[in-house]
Amino acid sequence: MSKQRIRIRLKAFDHRLIDRSASEIVETAKRTGARVKGPIPLPTKMERFTVLISPHVNKDARDQYEIRTHKRLMDIMDPTDKTVDALMKLDLAAGVDVQIKLN
């Protein structure tokens, strides 16, 4: 598997969770002998929702909610077979979405 690259994208609502998962991935990849670039923080997506509190009148009474989606990007250069096996066996937190691409 030489001259290849594994690109890993992480998404989560909690920044502490995504940082912990990223450090676990980096530690696992380095332990198996691969080079790691990252984690690179990507822009945080913020979605804001405004909801009327009152069902009838009082248009000025509103609540605002916000969801932040944090993203990280990592490249694992020259992965070995041990690296791929270790990454597949890695148990990450439930709140982290992981996308893996082989190039």
From Swiss-Prot:
It holds the Pfam family Ribosomal_S10. GO terms for biological process: translation. SMART domains: Ribosomal_S10 (SM01403). Coiled coil: none annotated. InterPro entries: Ribosomal_uS10, Ribosomal_uS10_CS, Ribosomal_uS10_dom, Ribosomal_uS10_dom_sf. The keyword Transport does not apply. Keywords: Ribonucleoprotein, Ribosomal protein. GO terms for cellular component: ribonucleoprotein complex; ribosome. GO terms for molecular function: structural constituent of ribosome; tRNA binding. Belongs to the universal ribosomal protein uS10 family. Involved in the binding of tRNA to the ribosomes. Part of the 30S ribosomal subunit. HAMAP family: Ribosomal_uS10. This is Small ribosomal subunit protein uS10. It comes from Thioalkalivibrio sulfidiphilus (strain HL-EbGR7). The gene is rpsJ.
